[in-house]
Each structure stands twice: as structure tokens, then as C-alpha cells.
Amino acid sequence: MGEDGFVTPPRREETLGLLLGFLGVAIFAATLPLTRLAVGSLSPQFLTTGRAVIAGLLAIPVLAIGRRAPPWRDFPRLALAALCLVVGFPGFSGLAMRGLPAAHASVIIGALPLATAAAGALIDGDRPSPGFWICAVAGSALVVAFALHSGGGALQAEDALLLAAVASAAVGYTLSAQLSRRMPARDVISWIVLLALPVTAPLSFLWRPENAASVPGSAWACLAYLGAMSAYLGFFAWNAGLARGGVARVSQAQLAQPFLSLGLAAWLLGERIDAETGLCAVAVVSLVFVGRRFRAGSAGRQISGASPAQALPLRRT
């Protein structure tokens, strides 16, 4: 048994789990840069609903092949998770990305693991140590200070939207973690996006571009990636990695995400990463790392009878 309460996986399984975990992180790291690229041609509303429609359509054959019965007793929790993960996070971040560089946004979103752990304490009954809370408060203060400094002493509306996106994702991941103790994690994300489909499909039609032919192919490619990978299939690699390598070990892979996002922002968007942004990203990731160390004893908590494969990651979008 490992310190996180799970059976320690064989080294080969652990290595495979880490590789899958890094694959999931790499998939998610492109979310903000591609959103920034797409909102130049597609509205945030269409981008939010369109990616959800793509994910929902992909979920139909997955659930049909598995012959999964609708989890009616979990409908309220699934609906709230869908509100947070299908509408809240992509909607708020999409609106924010109209006026913020992807590099700037990557620093703020880098605090998501701490926010998710805090949501787990408030909603799911986790009891992190005082050291974790110190890191959480310090990380939050650092993110707010970075936003204030970048905004000339005032919090920009886009920064407030990003903070709302972080809060939405944190609550959504916590609710998903609760649901994952009752059903496989892939079914949780599948039901979440499928449940939202009757709402997102007509809204995406309503908010579609007036002249779709004038939208560049790069914007459509970004939408396809966000829907298929960021909103759906990315969770498959991430969840499989957690199941094989252990939650406490593989979850450390997400520490690389802000740096991958910064690199993609520079490569895809030509954004200049100044020393201030880079140093702040390092500081936020360091606080996340230390905070996770403090809460290692409770990070792998699970209900009796639930397997590691059913534990949803404390991570996105």
C-alpha cells in the first residue's frame, strides 16, 4: 500500500500511467492558446456551445457501446457539474480570452489545482493541513497581485472572468469526483456532455456565425480540437493515467501545464513571454507543488469499494 491509501502499482504500470498523464496534460495545455486563436473569428458563445456539442456527439457511441443506463439518481449533481464544466469554465474563459494574452491567462489558470483542492475541502469533506491552506492563500494572493499589476492597479474584467472560470472548474471537478465513486470516470464526463446536448445544440445553432464560409479554417480546426480533445477525449488519457499510475503520483504531471501553455502561446500566437510572466508562473507552480505535498495524506481519499480507476482527476478542460 502507498501513502495515499492505494495499492502501489507495478513500475511498468506506473510508467505507463505517467506517460498517459503527461499526454492528458499536453492535450489540456492547448486549450487557452487555441481559444485565444479562435475567438478572433468565432464568438465566445458559439465556441462554448460548439465545443460542447462536439463532445456530446462523441459521447453517444461511447455510452451506447457500453450500454450504460442513465444514472437518474445522480441527475441533479450531473446537471450542476455540466453547468460548471460545459458552460462555466469554457464560457468565462472564452469571454476573457478576447482581451487577454494566452500567456497571461495561463498564469492565472495555473492556480486551478489549489482551487480544486479547496473546493474539495468545502464540498467533499476533504481536510487538508494548515500548510496546504497557507499555500492556497499565498497562491491566490500571488495570482490576484499579478492580475492587479498587469491591469495597472485595477482588476480587469477579463481577469475577473478568468477567476470565475477557475471557480467553476474547481466546483465542477469536485462534483465529478463525487460522481466517479459511483460510475467509471469516462461515463461521468460522457453523461455530463450528453446531458447538456439538448441545450447546447440549439444554442450553438442560434449563435452560429452569420457567414460560416468567411471563418478561416484555422478557427474551425481550433473548435474541433477544443470539442474533441479538451472537452472530452483528453479526459480519457488523463483518467487512464491516474488509474494505472496512482492519483498522487500522476497528478503531479499537471505542474507542467502552465509552462506548456506558455510555450504554445509563444509558438502559435507569437506572444512574447516576459520575465515577469515567467517568474510568476514558476512561483504559482511552486506553491501548487508545495501545497500538494502538504495534502498528500488526503489527496487519494476514496470511498470504500471505489477503485482508483473511478477517481476523477482534480484537473480540466
What spans do the regions from the language model cover?
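Structural signature of hydrophobic alpha-helical transmembrane segments
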Residues: 40-55, 94-112, 156-168, 217-231
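Specific transmembrane alpha-helical segments of multi-pass solute transporters/efflux pumps
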Residues: 26-32, 60-109, 145, 227-245
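Transmembrane alpha-helices of multi-pass small-molecule transport proteins
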Residues: 2, 17, 41-88, 113-119, ...
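Glycine-/small-residue-enriched transmembrane alpha-helix faces in small-molecule transporters
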Residues: 1-49, 91, 95, 151-178, ...
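Hydrophobic transmembrane alpha-helices of multi-pass small-molecule transport proteins
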Residues: 59, 79, 111, 119, ...
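C-terminal-most transmembrane helix of multi-pass membrane proteins
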Residues: 2-10, 19, 50-52, 148-149, ...
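Helix-helix packing/entry segments at the starts of transmembrane helices
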Residues: 48-50, 90, 104-111, 175-198, ...
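Membrane-interface helix-cap regions at the ends of transmembrane helices
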Residues: 30, 34-37, 41, 55-72, ...
